[in-house]
C-alpha cells in the first residue's frame, strides 16, 4: 500500500496559508475521505506524487490533457516561446490570429472569437454579450451544469459545488439569483415553461451539450434540437458551454458530434494544452458587439498571452493532423466493456455514461439523464471505490460527480490494468 507522508505534511502546511489547503475545492478529497495527494511530476498518462508513488492518470488536469502530460511537441514549442519570444507583451501578437483562424476552421458555430484566461471568463463574457445584444436580463441554465464560478452560475451548480453538497453559494445576491432560471436537463417541457413564464425576458440559454460536472450526462439530440428551435422562435441566444467537451468528444466538439449549431460557444481546457486559457466565439453578428468594436465590454491583461497560445495552437495542430478520436473512442469503449463485465461477474448493475473518451461510473442503478438522477448515486460507495483504485495506482477524480478522461497516451496495457483494478475496487465498494 502506498504511503503519503510527505503529502500529509504539505497539506497541513498548505492549510495555514490557503483556504482549505487547496486552490480549487474538489481537490480537497472531502467527499472521498483522506488528504489530497500532492503531485511532483506528470509524464504521458502517469503522475508521480511527492512520496514517489506513481499513478495512472484519468483526471488529465480536469480535461486538458487529451494528448497526455508533457507531450514532446507541446513542450518543445513552449520552450521555444519561453526562450525566444517571451511570456507576455500586453499588445496584439500574430499567434492570436493563428489560433483564431484555427478555431473558426474547426468549430462549426464560430465566425469570430475572443481569447480570455479561463472557462469561467468565457462563460461570463458570453452571457454578458447575450444580454447586451438582446437587451434582456434573465438566463436559463440547467440543474447540475457547471459553467464556472461566476455568480450567475452558482445556482444549482455542478462540479465542486455539487461535490461538497452546496450547489448554491453564499455571496450570490438575490437579484443575481432571480435572473438565473434553472431547467431540468434533457427535459424540454421544463425549458418551455420557463420561457413562457418569462416571455420576452430570456437573453440566453446556456448548456453543456455533454454535461461533465454532474458526472457525465450526454444531452439527447432531440433535446438539443428542440432548444435550437425554441431559441430561434423566441430570439434567445443559445450558448453551448464546450469548455470540457469541446475538442474532446470530437474535433469540433459536441456541436459537430450532434450536428446542432449554437449562437455562441465557450471553450477552454484543451485549447490551452494545460495552461490557463478560455475563449468565446460565435456568429459575427453577435461578436461584433464586443468592445472595442461594440459596446459590450470585455478585457484581460493576459488574454492571448504567448505561452497559452503556443500550447493551444500546437495541441490543435496535433489533433487535426492525427485525428485521434476513433482511437480514443475505442479506448473508452474498452474500459466501459471491461467495467460492465466486472459488474456482471459481481452481480452489480451500476450505470455507466460515456461519450468517446469522457466517462463516468455512477453508483446507482437509476439511468442517469439529469441532475435528479445523478444525485441518486451512492457517494459513500464511490468513496470506497476511489480509495481502492488509488491504492492500486489508478488516480480518478475525487468525486462521484466528475468525469474520467482517457488520453492518447493510455496504452492497452494501461487499460487492462485499469479494468483489473476496477474489479477489486467494485468489491471494496460493495462489501
From Swiss-Prot:
The protein's name: Glutamate-1-semialdehyde 2,1-aminomutase
Residue numbers carrying N6-(pyridoxal phosphate)lysine: 269
Major location category of this protein: cytoplasm
Keyword Heme: no
Organism: Chlorobium luteolum (strain DSM 273 / BCRC 81028 / 2530)
Keyword Ribosomal protein among record annotations: no
Catalysed transformations (reactions): (S)-4-amino-5-oxopentanoate = 5-aminolevulinate
Gene: hemL
GO cellular component, one term: cytoplasm
Cofactor: pyridoxal 5'-phosphate
Cellular compartment(s): Cytoplasm
Entry-linked SUPFAM superfamilies: PLP-dependent transferases
Entry GO MF terms: glutamate-1-semialdehyde 2,1-aminomutase activity; pyridoxal phosphate binding; transaminase activity
One Gene Ontology biological process: protoporphyrinogen IX biosynthetic process
Keywords assigned by UniProt, alphabetized: Chlorophyll biosynthesis, Cytoplasm, Isomerase, Porphyrin biosynthesis, Pyridoxal phosphate
